[in-house]
Curated annotation (Swiss-Prot):
The lineage of its organism: Eukaryota, Metazoa, Ecdysozoa, Arthropoda, Hexapoda. One of its GO terms (biological process) is maintenance of mitotic sister chromatid cohesion. This is MAU2 chromatid cohesion factor homolog. It comes from Culex quinquefasciatus (Southern house mosquito). It comes from the Eukaryota. Required for association of the cohesin complex with chromatin during interphase. Plays a role in sister chromatid cohesion and normal progression through prometaphase.
Length: 616
C-alpha cells in the first residue's frame, strides 16, 4: 500500500468502528466503509482480515447469513496458506464452521476445522480450541467415537505443551462423551485420571474449583444414569459445596480467572450457568429419590435464576436447562396428582422448543414431549392417547433409557387395556434388548415391578411376589422411595388377595408412610382402598371409616383436577402425534369434545391396581 492508501485504509477502519459503536449502531454505514477498502486493492493480509471483519459484523448484527458466509469463505481461502497470520486464519475457520453448523451443514464445517487443526499444531491455544470445536461438531451429529478420538488427541497435545488445566478439560469432556456412549467402566477410569490431576497438579485454586464442579457434575450424572441414588449423595454434597464457593461474593469474576494466559482461557460454563446446572442435577436426584417437594422447590429456584440470566443475555443453553427442568417438574406434578399444572407446563415446554433457533430443541426433545403427553394421558386413563404418544416416543428416540422408560409405561397401558399379546411382546422385547446392557438400577427395578404387576393381574400371586421382592431389593439398595412405595402397595394387594391380612398390613403401612412423604397421590389412593378392605376384614369399623374417608378425599381431588384439565385448550395436545406441535395457544375455559369428562375422571379415581405410572 502507498502512504495515501494506508491513510485511507486507516480512516475507513476508524469510520467503520465509529459507526459500529454509535448509539444506536449504524451497521449499514459500517459495512459500506469496510467494503470500500476493497477498491484500493489491498495486500492479501488486509483483504483477508477485512473479509473476516465483514463476516463478523454480518453475523453479529444482521440476518444476512449468506453474505456473511461469502465473506468468511473468501477470508478462509485467502488466509489458509499465509504464514504468521494465526489469529485471522483460525478465527475465520472457527467462525465459518460455526456458520455452517447454524445452517445445518456440518459436512462443510468438518473439513474446514480439520484443515485448521492440521495448520495450528504450533499454536497451543488455537489447536486446542479447534479440537474442542470439531469434537463438539461430531458429538452434535452423534458421531461420538470420532468426538472421543479428537478429545484423546487433545489430551496428548496438552501433554507435549505441559498444559495441565487444558488436559483436565479434555479428559472431563471425553468422560462426558463416554457417558453418552454408555461406556461405564471407561467413564470411571477417565474420571479417576482427571480427579488425580485436579487434586494434585492444578495449582491455581480458582481453576481447581471450576474443574471440581465439572468433575462432580459428571460424577453425579454418571451415578444417576446408573440409578444409584444413594451412592451419589456424597458426590452431590461435594458439588453443592463447590458451587457455593464459586458463587460467594468474594470470588473473582470469570474474566479475571480465565484471562491469565492463553492455555487457561478455556471455560466449560460461566459460573452463573454452573449454578443453574447444579440445581438441575439436584432436581434430577430429588426426582429419582422420590422427594417431589424438594424437586419442585429446586426447580422453581432454577427457573427464577434462568429468567434472571435471560434478561441479561438470552443464551441458547438457558432454554436447554429450562426444558430439562420442565420435563422433571411435569413428572413431579403427575406423581402428586396435579395434572392441570402438568399439562400447562407441557404446553410451556412445547413453546420453548418451538421458539428455539431452527427448532433445534424440538428436534432434540420431541420424543420427551410425546413421552410426557403419554404419562399425562395415562394418568387420566386416556389409554388410547397414551398408547399413541408412547409409541411415537419409542419410534423417534435414539436414547436407550428413554425407549425403555416409554416401553415400561406402554406395558402398563396394555395391561390396563387387557391386551395380553401386546404386553407380552413388550416384556419379551425389553428382556431381550436389556439382558446384555448395564441399565439404570431404577429402570431395571421398574421392569421387575411391571412383571410383578402383570403376574398379579393374572392371579399368579407366587410369581408376583418373586418379581416384587426383586424390585424391593433393588429399590431399597439405592433409596428409590417411589419404586419402594409402589412395590409395597402392590405386594400388600397380593397378600390381601390370598387372605393374608397380617402381611398385607405390614406392607401397606410403610407404603402409605412413604407415599405421604413423597407425596404420591396414586399410591395413597390405592393404599387407602386396601386399608379400607383390611379394616373391614379385621372388624375395625372406625379405622375402616377413616380409610374410606381418605380414599374418598384422594378420589375427589383427582376427579376435580381431571375435570379442570379437560376444560383447558392445552389438553388438545394429546392429539399431537406427528410433525410440529401446534403453535402457542390461549387457554380457554370451554370443555373438550370427546369422552365425557366425568366418566374419564371417575376411571382415574377408581384406584385400580397399576393406575400409577412409572417414573425414573
Amino acid at each position: 500500500m502507498t502512504s495515501s492508501q494506508d491513510a485511507c485504509y486507516i480512516s475507513l477502519l476508524g469510520l467503520a468502528e465509529y459507526f459500529r459503536t454509535s448509539s444506536p449502531p449504524n451497521i449499514k454505514k459500517c459495512i459500506q466503509c469496510l467494503q470500500a477498502l476493497f477498491t484500493f486493492k489491498p495486500p492479501l493480509k488486509v483483504e483477508a482480515r477485512t473479509h473476516l471483519q465483514l463476516g463478523q459484523i454480518l453475523m453479529a448484527y444482521t440476518k444476512n447469513t449468506e453474505l456473511a458466509r461469502n465473506h468468511l469463505e473468501q477470508a478462509w481461502m485467502l488466509s489458509e496458506n499465509i504464514n504468521n497470520f494465526d489469529d485471522v486464519k483460525f478465527d475465520t475457520a472457527s467462525l465459518l464452521a460455526q456458520l455452517y453448523q447454524q445452517q445445518e451443514q456440518s459436512s462443510l464445517a468438518k473439513p474446514v476445522l480439520r484443515k485448521a487443526i492440521e495448520l495450528s499444531q504450533h499454536n497451543v491455544y488455537w489447536h486446542c480450541k479447534l479440537l474442542f470445536q470439531l469434537a463438539q461438531t461430531h458429538a452434535t451429529d452423534k458421531e461420538y467415537a470420532l468426538a472421543s478420538e479428537l478429545l484423546a488427541v487433545g489430551v496428548e497435545s496438552t501433554d507435549e505443551s505441559n498444559a495441565t488445566y487444558l488436559k483436565s478439560l479434555f479428559l472431563l469432556s471425553r468422560a462426558m462423551i463416554m457417558m453418552i456412549e454408555r461406556k461405564s467402566s471407561d467413564v470411571l477410569a477417565i474420571l479417576n485420571q482427571a480427579g488425580t490431576i485436579i487434586d494434585n497438579a492444578i495449582q491455581n485454586i480458582h481453576l481447581k474449583e471450576y474443574l471440581k464442579v465439572f468433575f462432580f457434575v459428571l460424577q453425579v450424572c454418571h451415578y444417576l444414569q446408573l440409578g444409584q441414588v444413594k451412592t451419589v449423595k456424597t458426590s452431590l454434597k461435594q458439588l453443592q459445596q463447590s458451587i457455593q464457593t464459586i458463587m460467594a461474593p468474594n470470588w473473582p469474576s470469570d474474566e479475571q480467572i480465565f484471562g491469565q494466559n492463553s492455555t487457561e482461557m478455556f471455560m466449560w460454563l460461566p459460573k452463573e450457568q454452573l449454578y443453574v446446572l447444579v440445581y438441575l442435577v439436584t432436581v434430577s436426584h430429588s426426582m429419582m429419590a422420590g422427594y417431589m417437594d424438594k424437586a419442585q422447590k429446586y426447580t422453581e429456584k432454577a427457573l427464577t435464576q434462568i429468567e434472571k440470566l435471560k434478561s441479561q443475555e438470552n443464551k441458547p443453553i438457558l432454554a436447554v436447562f429450562q426444558i430439562i427442568l420442565l420435563e422433571h417438574i411435569i413428572m413431579c406434578r403427575l406423581v402428586m396428582g396435579n395434572k392441570s399444572l402438568a399439562i400447562k407446563e407441557i404446553a410451556l415446554a412445547k413453546d420453548v422448543c418451538l421458539s428455539s433457533s431452527h427448532k433445534f430443541l424440538l428436534k432434540k426433545h420431541s420424543p420427551q414431549l410425546h413421552c410426557l403427553l403419554g404419562l399425562y394421558s395415562m394418568s387420566a386413563s386416556l389409554f388410547d392417547h397414551a398408547e399413541r404418544q408412547f409409541y411415537t416416543c419409542i419410534q423417534e428416540t435414539t436414547e436407550r433409557d428413554l425407549k425403555l422408560f416409554a416401553n415400561l409405561n406402554l406395558a402398563i397401558v396394555y395391561l390396563r387395556m387387557k391386551r395380553e399379546p401386546d404386553l407380552r411382546a413388550i416384556l419379551d422385547q425389553v428382556q431381550q434388548e436389556n439382558s446384555l446392557c448395564s441399565n439404570s438400577q431404577a429402570l431395571m427395578g421398574s421392569f421387575y415391578y411391571v412383571q410383578g404387576l402383570n403376574a398379579f393381574h393374572k392371579s399368579s400371586f407366587h410369581e408376583a411376589k418373586r418379581f416384587l421382592r426383586e424390585t424391593l431389593k433393588m429399590a431399597n439398595a439405592e433409596d428409590l422411595n417411589r419404586l419402594t412405595s409402589c412395590s409395597l402397595v402392590l405386594l400388600s394387594h397380593v397378600f390381601l388377595s390370598i387372605g393374608n391380612s397380617k402381611e398385607s398390613m405390614n406392607m401397606v403401612t410403610p407404603a402409605m408412610q412413604l407415599a405421604s412423604k413423597i407425596p404420591d397421590i396414586h399410591v395413597q389412593l390405592w393404599g387407602s382402598a386396601i386399608l379400607k378392605d383390611l379394616h373391614r376384614m379385621l372388624k375395625e369399623p372406625a379405622l375402616e371409616q377413616e380409610a374410606y374417608n381418605n380414599h374418598l378425599n384422594f378420589s375427589q381431588n383427582l376427579i376435580a383436577d381431571q375435570l379442570k384439565c379437560t376444560k383447558f385448550q392445552e389438553h388438545t395436545l394429546i392429539n399431537w402425534i406427528q410433525g410440529d406441535p401446534p403453535m402457542p395457544m390461549l387457554t380457554t375455559q370451554e370443555p373438550m369434545m370427546g369422552e365425557p369428562s366425568q366418566a374419564a375422571a371417575m376411571r382415574v379415581a377408581a384406584g385400580a391396581p397399576g393406575q400409577q405410572v412409572i417414573f425414573q
